[in-house]
Amino acid sequence: MTVAAPAKVQYEAVIGLEVHCQLSTRSKIFSSSATAFGAPPNTQIDPICMGLPGTLPVLNEKVLEYAVKAGLALNCTIAPYSKFDRKQYFYPDLPKNYQISQYDLPIATHGWIEIQLSDGRTKRIGITRLHMEEDAGKLVHAGSDRLSGSSYSLVDFNRAGVPLIEIVSEPDIRSGEEAAEYVQELRRILRYAGLCDGNLQEGSLRCDVNISVRPLGSQTFGTKVEIKNMNSFNAIQRAIEYEFNRQVKAVEAGERIVQETRLWEENSQRTISMRKKEGSSDYRYFPEPDLPPIRVTEAQKTRWQAELPELPGVKRRRYQEVYGLSVYDARYLSDERNTAEYFEAVIAAGADPKAAANWMMSDIASYLNTHKLDYPDIALKPETLAELIGLIEQGTISSKIAKEILPELLEKGGSARALVEAKGMTQISDSALLGQMIAEVLAENPEQLQQYRGGKTKLFGYFVGQLMKKTQGRADPKLANDLLKQHLDG
């Protein structure tokens, strides 16, 4: 009697993300010190953010406004009443030895965003909560990128007290791709709303991953592991893929997953153990006694909601439904607010949406990438691009001529029509004149003409090239082809 081998267990990842976003305010959350990135160490500090005795925090009103706007943009319920709490822990970059955060009454809860995956599917990811807190300082390690292995460490307190919102997702994410797209969509939304610049390299947007594995179909959560130190979207995806495989191998080998914090090492493309993961009880939260409770009125919510721009998800759908753009084109053009605003200005100036999209996604995108520029940096105004597209549609110039003059318009601006006229580049659409030029081309190439009329019709392209050369590329392509065909076959 034979016994069939048991089927191999399939596992799935259960992933939740904690995304910390520095708000784009000019001053810190509880004091007036500046928040600019890149200032010399310890030049943007004050007694409050350094936790000196006798100082009292005062909430920056702009932080509350930005936090509520973020909650509204993420479809959250805004709490009419919330409060700050002290989160106790000891680390060199935390001068007070506690962080002012929010624990049981956050400013926003129960939100969601939709992400779009590479296979075209959309998925809704829930947001558990959004809360305000202050950032810590930054440790700079000599001789290593972390404390282990460094000869000594210095502390830059410029970042201490910079306002943060922490956005905690539901454990709805199942892959590295979904996680990376979720963070990218969060970044798009916050950048559109002008709340955070979303620069991962500068640390203004930081993501911690909580991941566990379980048999596919199981409803029981496994032991979660936290991953830190990912400073790109690709790093988030790779770290999750590595950690998922590590945990599956450990489970299959009968090992116990330890609840811990692990560090993503970019050079070795692996996670390494950093420390035991703390629980909320380890932080000994209690209400912040130096700050009053926060109240958000309906009037404030209504005003701040009205100040939000059209967000990228809504814009993508509108581009597809109103302008007939593809999913890819709509996504590209709505990805950054500067791009979307330029595109809409071109359309407002009278350009065909699909033609505007084609120019922006090809020649202009190539120019921007080559010169590391953005739309506000170029001299080509939206009205001029619309004018250029109009000249092509009117038959005044060909697409080839438009591509030739585009670099000058991008660098110097000005009128497309005036430039075409100054250079004498208007399209030749006179049938009689083109017919005369075609006759000259045929007379200059008797051997090729004889071969063509002898059956070698592939030479048609040769004659097109000769005609374009004679007209300096100014011949109306369709008219030129039709007339050339008539002369060759006549």
From Swiss-Prot:
Biological processes annotated in GO: glutaminyl-tRNAGln biosynthesis via transamidation; translation
Enzyme class: ligase
Keyword Protein biosynthesis on entry: yes
GO MF term set: asparaginyl-tRNA synthase (glutamine-hydrolyzing) activity; ATP binding; glutaminyl-tRNA synthase (glutamine-hydrolyzing) activity
E.C. numbers: 6.3.5.-
Presence of keyword Repeat: no
UniProt xrefs under PANTHER family: GLUTAMYL-TRNA GLN AMIDOTRANSFERASE SUBUNIT B MITOCHONDRIAL AND PROKARYOTIC PET112-RELATED, GLUTAMYL-TRNA(GLN) AMIDOTRANSFERASE SUBUNIT B, MITOCHONDRIAL
Sequence similarity: Belongs to the GatB/GatE family. GatB subfamily.
Protein purpose: Allows the formation of correctly charged Asn-tRNA(Asn) or Gln-tRNA(Gln) through the transamidation of misacylated Asp-tRNA(Asn) or Glu-tRNA(Gln) in organisms which lack either or both of asparaginyl-tRNA or glutaminyl-tRNA synthetases. The reaction takes place in the presence of glutamine and ATP through an activated phospho-Asp-tRNA(Asn) or phospho-Glu-tRNA(Gln).
NCBIfam families: gatB, PRK05477.1-2, PRK05477.1-4
Protein name, as recorded: Aspartyl/glutamyl-tRNA(Asn/Gln) amidotransferase subunit B
